[in-house]
Amino acid sequence: MFNLFLFILSTYGYVSCLEKRLAVSPYLSWILVIAGQSLTIFAFALLNLLQPAMYLIYYLGFILLAVYLFLQSRSSQESFLDLFKRKFSWISLIFLLTFLIWVIFMKEMPLIFWDNFSHWGLIVKFFFNEQRLATDLDKIIYYRSYPPAVSLYINYVVNFLGYSEGHMIIGNFMVNLAALYAFFTPFNVKKNKITGFLVLFLIAVFYLMDDHVKMYNLLVDNLLAYLTLAGFAGLYHYRENRKISSLIVIILAGFLGLVKGSGIFFAVLLIAVYCYYLAKYDKAKVPFSLKKYLPVLLTLLPFAMWKLYVRLMYDTSQFRHSVHFDWSQLHLKAKIVAKFILQSLDPWTPSTWGLFLIVVIVLVMLLVTARDKKLQKKIMTFSGILFAVLLLYYLSTMAMYLTAMPMDEAIKLAQFDRYTLTGVFVGLGSISLVAIKYFESRVEDKSDHSLYGKKHIYSGLIGIYFISLAYDLVDAVIEKRNFISESIPYEYQKMGIDNHKLNNKKVLVLASGKWNTDNAGNLYLYTPNTHLYKGNPDVVKNYDQILVLDNKEATQTWVKELTGQQLAPGFYDVKDVVNEKLIQK
């Protein structure tokens, strides 16, 4: 916990610098700092200076904090405690409480979701141990062309908190929470508290609708939406401030392009909003100068650098998720399209509920602005653009199923809600923030005339927020309990297996239970040459060792079949225990 406190202090050094030097909103500063640190670490990692970059960033944060406190003490008569109270809003208190609750519950949380083993968790472990980006020689990471920004930041966190799966989850949560905190940027929550509570309610809706990704793992699908909305909020608030809006688009759009492959879609949305405000509010004599639109080029630089690195360092033709289109499977492609359309219209999916809420909010907005035709026209234009973007996102998701996903996964529309909900969250968040901003401009919070009623509303909205957070935490506790009692991956942890020395040992794993993924072996044994035994004795000759993970009946049946004896959980050399006939076969 003390290491976490120090880490937060180091981060706050940068936050205080942004607030003091550039007058950036305290709500927006945290995600700008985290994203900026990730991009800086990425740039150094390209130069093979990953570890020096992390130490430089970490200790520089303390120097900046010391300078800030020194300057503050000279320019203000306030004590540090008074300054803290003045800058620490009730929203900050709620988010601090959220973070502390999450840390308490997540510090012992294991990685659960499949993708944590196949790439996200494995990539963080690789960065932690090897302190460099992967190359084509590092076969242990199959998905090594995945953008690394969030993994690099999580690695930065675990380098100073200590390596554990719980610390990985806490690091990922820090990025998500910082992005959600930025939603409050355009609102004056001190003057009009109700708007702050409505934004909290929006976040609660996100918690409740998220039925697949959750924040107790390392998946980044929801983070894409939160970062995009954070960017929208910041760009709107600083639409007339070219310096800060340029900083926002360079950092957040650049970061989005390195969060996930589909992040470039949302980066382009941020760039489009930035260009719109630039064209509207910048009165420069030369409308299309290179200097004016230089931030756009800088925004695309991290993505271009990563693509160049992938092109130079990897043979991507071997990846199952590389872009392709097999014309011989047109009948299957047609089935995928039909199934995608039906699934998109299914009223029982969270993404459809989100679309329904968007339509409801648009209709309500049109109704309440009926007397203001000019404003109503703006809302209609905004809504039209919003639905066009959502349609484009759905079409791009369908194209991913058709061209960039293995057929066995595509035909089942694997992770449909997880992918579509990202776009829906962006749409729902955008229209909700617009509606709350309209509400803020029409409602004053100064009068005591309905103070009793307001307290009830505020209490109710805070209650809903913490109930939604509790829903996520209870879900995490249930998942953890099931995972511990039924999963194959957790057997590695029970046996204390967590190798940190990269190796090429060929290990055949004998185990039975749920979450039967080979990738858990890659993570814990730290070798690319490990697989679960599927019942075919002919494969045993290809391995150096067998690992018996448990004493379950199905596992021991396989052990008896291969060795002719019962073996306790542990490692065994194939030549010592396996029937010679199987080795020579």
Segment roles from a protein language model:
Residues 1-85:
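Membrane-embedded, hydrophobic transmembrane alpha-helices
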Residues 40-45, 245-261, 265-272, 343:
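Membrane-interface alpha helices of multi-pass inner-membrane proteins
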Residues 87-101, 251-253, 284-309, 383-389:
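Hydrophobic alpha-helical membrane-interfacial segments at the cytosolic entry of transmembrane helices
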Residues 108-111, 153, 276-280, 286-366, ...:
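Membrane-lumen/periplasm interface segments of specific transmembrane helices
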Residues 109-123, 129-153, 163:
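Extracytoplasmic catalytic/substrate-binding loops of multi-pass membrane glycan-assembly enzymes
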Residues 244-253, 267, 271, 291-301, ...:
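Signature aromatic-anchored transmembrane alpha helix within multi-pass, membrane-resident enzymes
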Residues 466-520:
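Membrane-embedded, lumen/periplasm-facing catalytic core of multi-pass transferases
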